[in-house]
């Protein structure tokens, strides 16, 4: 059975010591969805939003968030990310925006939290930029899609 790595023998939260681990190439992908009214989505797609390019702003927010995950999640290590990618796709048939993030590095610990943070921050940025038009948008299905590298092995989410 797996144990919680961030809890010490006294039941206290602690940062995992990764100093003895070997560097390996690690990669993680995550996704999130923002569901909204068709009119809100059309405003984003057409580029007519008064605050500017929603997708470009959300992409930059996701990249910045991945780089600063260690400042947001208390027990995360600061990481030297070698790649962060955030892709946004309008899904008009579902009135959604799909966000997929990719984080990669060669290091001692995984990048799952960075990928999840990137997707989440991009979704939050879409909400922030569009809340004046629609307050009942829904951010949902934030999840890890895959991870590779490290001693715990690879993971691929079920469809």
From Swiss-Prot:
Pathway: Cofactor biosynthesis; molybdopterin biosynthesis. The keyword Lyase applies. The keyword Phosphoprotein does not apply. Substrate binds at residues 75-77, 113-114. InterPro entries: MoaC (IPR023045), MoaC_bact/euk (IPR047594), MoaC_sf (IPR036522), MoCo_biosynth_MoaA/MoaC (IPR050105), Mopterin_CF_biosynth-C_dom (IPR002820). GO terms for molecular function: cyclic pyranopterin monophosphate synthase activity; GTP 3',8'-cyclase activity. It is an enzyme of class 4 (lyase). GO terms for biological process: Mo-molybdopterin cofactor biosynthetic process. It catalyses: (8S)-3',8-cyclo-7,8-dihydroguanosine 5'-triphosphate = cyclic pyranopterin phosphate + diphosphate. SUPFAM superfamilies: Molybdenum cofactor biosynthesis protein C, MoaC (SSF55040). CDD domains: MoaC_PE. Its EC number is 4.6.1.17. It holds the Pfam family MoaC. The active site is at residue 128. Disulfide bonds: none annotated. Coiled coil: none annotated. Keywords: Lyase, Molybdenum cofactor biosynthesis. Belongs to the MoaC family. Catalyzes the conversion of (8S)-3',8-cyclo-7,8-dihydroguanosine 5'-triphosphate to cyclic pyranopterin monophosphate (cPMP). Homohexamer; trimer of dimers. NCBIfam families: moaC, PRK09364.1. This is Cyclic pyranopterin monophosphate synthase.
């Amino acid at each position: 059975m797996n144990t919680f790595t961030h809890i010490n023998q006294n039941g206290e939260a602690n940062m995992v010591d990764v100093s003895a681990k070997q560097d390996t190439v690690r990669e993680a992908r995550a996704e999130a969805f923002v569901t909204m009214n068709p009119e809100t989505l059309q405003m984003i797609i057409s580029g007519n939003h008064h605050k500017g390019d929603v997708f470009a702003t959300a992409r930059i927010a996701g990249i910045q968030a991945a780089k600063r995950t260690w400042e947001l999640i208390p027990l995360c290590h600061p990481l030297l990310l070698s790649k962060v990618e955030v892709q946004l796709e309008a899904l008009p048939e579902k009135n959604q925006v799909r966000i997929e993030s990719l984080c990669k590095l060669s290091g001692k610990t995984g990048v799952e939290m960075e990928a999840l943070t990137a997707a989440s921050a991009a979704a939050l940025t879409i909400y922030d930029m569009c809340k004046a038009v629609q307050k009942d948008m829904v951010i949902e299905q934030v999840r890890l899609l895959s991870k590779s590298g490290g001693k715990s092995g690879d993971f691929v989410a079920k469809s």
